[in-house]
Amino acid sequence: MAIDKLALIKEVRERTNGGMIDVKKSLEESNWDVEKAIIWLKSNGKIKAAKKADRVSAEGSLAIAKNAKRAVLVEINCETDFVAKNEQFKTAVQTVANALLESQVNNNEDLNKVVINGVTLNEFIDNLTATIGEKISFRRFVSLTANENEVLGAFAHINGQIGALVKIKGQNEELARNVAMHAAAMKPEYVFVNQVPAERIEILKAEFVKPTGFENKPANIQEKILQGSLDKKLAEFVLEKQAFMIDDSLTIEKLLSTQNSQLLDAVRYTVGEGIEKVVTDFAAEVAQQMNK
């Protein structure tokens, strides 16, 4: 079976932050065995000592912890996709989510009160950084609390990259979860129309193209046509106006109304959104070195 040398070099580089030439040599000296190559790099002092605190953590994973009255969504970042898929890392992210759920902490100012396995949250993250060998960063969390006659829904994509929480009126847990699943899949920017900046609404209205005969219609009909056009545009990015992914004959707003329910709150995370990633063209770099 042929050895995928490029993939092996990429893996060792991601795990060690070693230089390209050193990584290539370590694999050659170790008969292309990744674990032996890492040992070779360590024993020969070739692993870069770049400060982890200065490196960018743009990969990572999400986790959700939930009970009947509270739900927590947390994002923790790492440097590489390799670590993001690591079971030890994913288990640690879930451990943090569970601790946040139990702590009843609702804001960043109180995070120092969270204790995990006898240490503070910051210490837990620092220990994880030391154990895994990459910069691990606690990025953010959000919690929703259900009051009387309210229910929470939660959905996390199997790859741990997308998660959503919703709160609705009533006690229909399946409905709440379906709306959370929709929010995760359809990526709304806002929950409610009244959250959309007025300037953006005006831009959408200005984009309206009058249909033939529009000027001859009564004012109330013109207003309905204009509102219909606006609602169609809002449906692209406002949760309550979006067509329900399971039954697109209903908007989320109407779906909940038919179930005597109401959308109260929602939040959606995607790992790394808003973080500028450092992109390395491993293929080009490896090809250049392999030809030397």
Which residue stretches match the model-derived regions?
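N-terminal assembly/interaction segments in proteins that build large macromolecular machines
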Residues: 2-292
